[in-house]
């Protein structure tokens, strides 16, 4: 059965242009998703109080953990679909998509229930100040009501991207992003609903994005998704979880370590929390450029690895590293140069702007280092080695970072000393990931495809 790839053929021809075309919508999608939270922060800061801004802000790392776990789990669906595409197994795609959507809904409902139970304990864990605790808990509980729709969007988008369609998920998220801003202003500035209005706006916009991508899956001639269809892929759940769980753990461990950092930031009061929140919005937006290339590396590697095109897998690694470094460095330095002006978009409070500047100076200058472990990790996941990147992240970012907090930071408890941990631990993770790439050797040596042509070799 002939399989028509939606937007591009990842198995033949030039790679560089296709990687850029594929990556740009993913990066923009992630940025728009982060702008949901940035809009929440900006509206809370301008139409509420400093405490309202801090209540939303203290949830930033918890929500980043939730979003990262969802995205990580969806990578399993992406790899499963991409391997079927690489092997030209079009007949297996409808059942695989059906399995992915059922799994997303089941995990989403479980997450919704856990969110209602765990909201207060999580906020206690990170030492949320009492003056903002109730508002922060309310925001998190309402936010978690939309968790099933977040998972449905992520899994649906992962399925579409596996066939080369990264454009439609971006357009769906862009539309819901505009809706989020409008609803934020309506509920918070107009109806004065406070942090509850901010959270409800995010939930409704997430529902819209999920509806749009599910509609696309239903109309796709190959996927043929239908809610009442009972087809399922044999071993499909295990195939998704085998890659998805390590990827989710990798992201979760990274965010979990950041929650420990957030707990340390919380000791410095509401202004430090608000400043850190503003800086994190910029960090995530720029970091998503890197993770978009890592996602591209995973998808392209999955298809080519399944098709036996190992030489192209090596080319994918090199190109993604080079392009990601090139595309990410300029925004990092632009944010550093204009940090005060950009922070002023979120709040007029001079002390908060200064606090945001401290974090930006300590971290964003070094964030391009993340390319050197995220891209190889994406290639390893696409090659079927999802566990090692999770383990290296667990050691390099979680264990070392927590150790830093309880040793170096405890000896000198200042915000710069806390933030300096990040670039040092990124370097440690780079070393661990490089060792894994050398040891696992995911691309067989001398595995040039016998039918490779000059056209397919051309970058």
Question: What spans do the regions from the language model cover?
Answer:
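Short alpha-helical transmembrane segments in multi-pass integral membrane proteins
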Residues: 1-23, 81-146, 188-245, 301-366, ...
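Short runs within selected transmembrane alpha-helices of multi-pass transporters and secretion channels
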Residues: 74, 143-161, 169-180, 198-213, ...
């Amino acid at each position: 059965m002939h399989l028509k790839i939606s937007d591009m053929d990842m198995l033949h021809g030039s790679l560089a242009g296709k990687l850029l075309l594929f990556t740009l919508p993913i990066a923009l999608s992630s940025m728009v998703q982060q702008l949901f939270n940035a809009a929440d922060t900006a509206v809370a800061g301008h139409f509420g109080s400093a405490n309202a801004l801090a209540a939303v802000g203290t949830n930033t790392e918890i929500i980043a953990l939730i979003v990262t776990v969802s995205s990580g789990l969806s990578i399993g669906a992406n790899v499963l679909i991409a391997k079927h595409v690489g092997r030209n197994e079009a007949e297996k795609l409808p059942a695989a998509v059906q399995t992915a959507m059922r799994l997303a809904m089941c995990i989403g409902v479980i997450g919704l229930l856990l969110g209602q139970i765990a909201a207060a304990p999580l906020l206690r864990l990170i030492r949320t100040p009492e003056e903002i605790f109730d508002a922060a808990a309310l925001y998190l509980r309402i936010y978690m009501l939309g968790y099933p729709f977040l998972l449905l969007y992520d899994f649906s988008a992962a399925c579409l991207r596996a066939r080369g369609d990264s454009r439609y998920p971006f357009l769906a998220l862009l539309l819901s992003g505009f809706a989020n801003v409008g609803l934020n202003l309506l509920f918070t500035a107009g109806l004065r609903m406070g942090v509850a209005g901010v959270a409800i706006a995010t939930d409704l916009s997430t529902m819209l994005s999920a509806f749009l991508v599910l509609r696309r899956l239903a109309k796709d001639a190959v996927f043929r998704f239908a809610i009442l269809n009972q087809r399922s892929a044999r071993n499909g759940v295990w195939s998704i979880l085998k890659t998805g769980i390590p990827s989710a753990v990798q992201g979760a461990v990274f965010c979990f370590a950041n929650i420990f950092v957030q707990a340390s930031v919380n000791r410095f009061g509401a202004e430090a929390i608000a400043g850190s929140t503003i800086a994190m919005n910029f960090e995530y937006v720029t970091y998503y450029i890197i993770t978009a290339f890592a996602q591209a590396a995973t998808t392209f590697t999955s298809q080519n690895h399944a098709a036996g095109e190992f030489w192209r897998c090596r080319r994918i690694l090199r190109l993604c590293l080079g392009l990601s470094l090139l595309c990410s460095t300029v925004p990092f330095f632009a944010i550093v140069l204009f940090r005060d002006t950009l922070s002023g978009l979120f709040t007029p409070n001079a002390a908060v702007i200064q606090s945001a500047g401290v974090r930006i100076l300590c971290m964003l200058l070094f964030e391009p280092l993340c390319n050197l472990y995220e891209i190889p990790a994406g290639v390893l996941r696409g090659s079927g080695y999802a566990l090692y990147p999770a383990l290296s992240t667990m050691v390099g970012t979680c264990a070392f970072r927590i150790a830093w907090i309880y040793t170096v930071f405890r000896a000198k408890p200042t915000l710069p000393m806390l933030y300096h941990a990040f670039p040092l631990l990124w370097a440690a993770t780079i070393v661990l990931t490089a060792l894994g790439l050398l040891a696992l050797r995911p691309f067989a040596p001398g595995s040039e495809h016998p039918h490779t042509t000059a056209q397919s070799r051309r970058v």
